[in-house]
Amino acid sequence: MNAMDAQPLYDLAPVAWLLGMGVLLALGPLIWVWRRHVGEGAGRRLQALTVLTLFLTFDLTLFGAFTRLSDSGLGCPDWPGCYGNASPLGARHEIAMAQAAQPTGPVTHGKAWVEMVHRYLATSVGFLILVLAVATWVVRRRERLAPHGSRRGVASLSAWWPAVTLVWVCLQGAFGALTVTWKLYPAIVTLHLLGAMVLLALLCIQAVRY
């Protein structure tokens, strides 16, 4: 049994660190949208955040393709961290052992970083979609409670669209985990890619309906 096979497939120890990293990365786009559209209506800010999230999701999909094509999908053979750590820095010893055991195998320091950056970006996109879902529900609720003449409107977008998108991105995260733990099983990899296309479509619908 090599070092990669001996590694547990799921190790939830670094979850809090990974979530924190995702939130930290998501703060950049959130602050940018807020500052750029300060003084504008909530609908305009939601539209801008939706378009930016769509752009970042497209970038994430491209980076996911790069992760697969560079053979980095198993750079960290467990999920959600890397050998139970929040980054490859904490897994230097385990990565070195796996690389020594399989010099041409899928685990190297470079591939581990590619895989973990993909996970960091995916977490940040997930957080942005969570913000969109919550913010849309809040704005729609305020509109329903406001006097009819003072309603500014969030166009014709239903709050269910961001909610469905949030559920879907959670499913995408689950497929991302299966992609790793099932050792890049072709059917799972294909479904994960198709899921990314559906996620892009959901965000496109929201972007054009604002």
Language model feature labels by segment:
Residues 45-50, 153-166:
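Membrane-interfacial loop-to-transmembrane alpha-helix junctions, especially the N-terminal start
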Residues 49-71:
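N-terminal signal-anchor transmembrane alpha helix
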Residues 15-35:
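Hydrophobic core of alpha-helical transmembrane segments in multi-pass integral membrane proteins
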Residues 13-20, 113-131, 188-201, 205:
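Membrane-interface loop-to-helix entry segments
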Residues 2-3, 69-116:
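Extracytosolic (periplasmic/ER-lumenal) interhelical loops and adjacent juxtamembrane/interface segments
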Residues 1-13:
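Short, strongly hydrophobic alpha-helical membrane anchors
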Residues 29-40, 133-142, 205-210:
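Structural signal for the C-terminal ends of transmembrane alpha-helices
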Residues 178-191:
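Membrane-interface helix caps and helix-loop-helix hairpins in membrane proteins
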